[in-house]
């Protein structure tokens, strides 16, 4: 059970009733928002009609669903997984990376404020990380990105500071 279900109207009312004077954007994140892409799109349109920017963080497993919500989103953080990530099995990785790269390309083409995030662990191989960087920077220039986040896992397989600095040193030249 993932909590209480709300209709779009109920969710819009919750948003309206809980906006604060200092609310500067509304985030769609946690779990995977694209699983409910139609609802995210409707809620994002509602938020934008209130004059607030919208932010989506997604692993972009489905570029068609991403394209559906993209017009209603202002800020995008696209989460990439390395080939050796334990979050997805090897045989599905090529399709995931294809979709994620398509989403990145679409966000840049749509002139969205775009961030990239790569989650790394102590098990992340430098070769896998470098290969992913090459794929990313074949289609995007750093001038088109608002940020590049290297996010360490915590508790389980947490990378050392030295490992994080090596990953950083490999992103920096781009």
Give the role of each language-model region.
Residues 30-31:
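Short acidic donor-binding/metal-coordinating loop in glycosyltransferase active sites
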Residues 10-19:
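A short, N-terminal amphipathic alpha-helix
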Residues 1, 168-174:
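Short, intrinsically disordered, charge-balanced linker/junction segments flanking boundaries
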Residues 22-25, 34-170:
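Conserved AdoMet/S-adenosylmethionine-binding subsite of the radical SAM
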Residues 1-10:
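Canonical Radical SAM [4Fe-4S] cluster-binding loop centered on the CxxxCxxC motif
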